[in-house]
């Protein structure tokens, strides 16, 4: 394999010395970039873009041409697994993801296909292989999947939700059925991420977007225990290289200590938690990723730089920080503000690594 020219991100995840704090942005490839919109139009629809390895590679690389990012992240969607399980993923204009055949009963769970990463999901692995080749060792490639709980919310609700009544009804009225579903999803995520690692992903991330809608007890029962299972099942080294894993629960600040106990290498933080208090709570057990409010990218360059400086000071000196937004970049953010953000992280973090 090609030697990495910039391994700052991987070094930070392994708590090794870096010259400056590494930075990437969740959803860095996407609709805020005019060049992305052109490729998306060329593909016809979102899933056609995901299924075309060359186009998925192109949009993955686009932000790296604009910004001095320390990592690339696979362009895909967390709902590829439910789609491959037979639920029929589609995107309604202006409404987000929908599933044609949501889960309503035990029979639906029993009938789920356990997807083969090199079968139904081979298009994702082809994209990973293509991106890894085209990166030519410039920066590492991050693979990812949704958490079992988050995937289950879409599979039971049939799409996005505000109140999560259907999945919570299942959790509280038929908990064993939900546990059966979550267990199947955990097994599928393990297979999927290990296949991404074999195809070339150098780090992986699990997105638990909706874990934060659960009570503390229910979070541990229905989300955290399945992410713990995933961490235990992942291939943590490949071809002599360690493969770090990051867990991210949006609105998960109250559970940092428990997330650190999963055995993950890093925890993603959203902007609702103070970086200094997060660091004080988990110590040096895990690396912290985050955590600027993505809406800060609407602000002036001066204000963006000020916020970056504040978060860097909050983390303080030393290693173990990957800078990121606290969630995905908004679709109407001016791209030039992304550059201000990335450049500010590199420039202002150098004194913390002397």
UniProtKB/Swiss-Prot annotation:
Compartments, record wording: Cytoplasm
Pfam families: URO-D
InterPro entries reported for this sequence: UROD/MetE-like_sf (IPR038071), Uroporphyrinogen_deCO2ase_HemE (IPR006361), Uroporphyrinogen_deCOase (IPR000257)
GO BP, sorted A to Z: protoporphyrinogen IX biosynthetic process from glutamate
Site, as annotated: Transition state stabilizer: 77
UniProt cross-references to PANTHER family, sorted A to Z: METHYLTETRAHYDROFOLATE:HOMOCYSTEINE METHYLTRANSFERASE RELATED, UROPORPHYRINOGEN DECARBOXYLASE
Protein name listed in UniProt: Uroporphyrinogen decarboxylase
Gene encoding the protein: hemE
């Amino acid at each position: 394999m090609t030697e990495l020219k910039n391994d700052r991100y991987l070094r930070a995840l392994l708590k090794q010395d870096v010259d400056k704090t590494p930075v990437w942005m969740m959803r860095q490839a996407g609709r805020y970039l005019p060049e992305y919109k052109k490729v998306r139009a060329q593909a016809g629809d979102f899933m056609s873009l995901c299924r075309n390895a060359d186009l998925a590679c192109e949009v993955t690389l686009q932000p790296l041409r604009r910004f001095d990012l320390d990592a690339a992240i696979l362009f895909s969607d967390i709902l590829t697994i439910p789609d491959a399980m037979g639920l029929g993923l589609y995107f309604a204009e202006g409404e987000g993801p929908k599933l044609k055949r949501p889960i309503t009963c035990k029979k639906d769970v029993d009938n789920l296909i356990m997807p083969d990463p090199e079968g139904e999901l081979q298009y994702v692995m082809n994209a990973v292989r293509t991106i890894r080749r085209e990166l030519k060792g410039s920066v590492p490639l991050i693979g990812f999947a949704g958490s079992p709980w988050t995937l289950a919310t879409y599979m039971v609700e049939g799409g996005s939700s505000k109140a999560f009544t259907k999945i919570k009804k299942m959790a509280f009225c038929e908990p064993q059925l939900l546990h059966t579903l979550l267990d199947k999803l955990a097994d599928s995520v393990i297979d999927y991420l290990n296949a991404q690692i074999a195809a070339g992903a150098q780090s992986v991330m699990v997105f638990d977007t909706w874990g934060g809608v659960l009570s503390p007890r229910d979070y541990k029962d229905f989300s955290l225990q399945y992410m713990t299972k995933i961490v235990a099942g992942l291939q943590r080294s490949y071809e002599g290289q360690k493969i770090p894993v990051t867990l991210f629960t949006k609105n998960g600040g109250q559970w940092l200590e428990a997330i650190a106990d999963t055995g993950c290498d890093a925890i993603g933080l959203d902007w609702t938690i103070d970086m200094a208090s997060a660091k004080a709570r988990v110590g040096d057990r895990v690396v912290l990723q985050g955590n600027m409010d993505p809406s800060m990218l609407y602000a002036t360059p001066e204000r963006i730089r000020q916020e970056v400086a504040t978060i860097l000071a909050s983390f303080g000196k030393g290693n173990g920080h990957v800078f990121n937004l606290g969630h995905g970049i908004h679709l109407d953010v001016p791209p030039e503000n992304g550059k201000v953000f990335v450049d500010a992280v590199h420039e202002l973090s150098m004194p913390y690594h002397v």
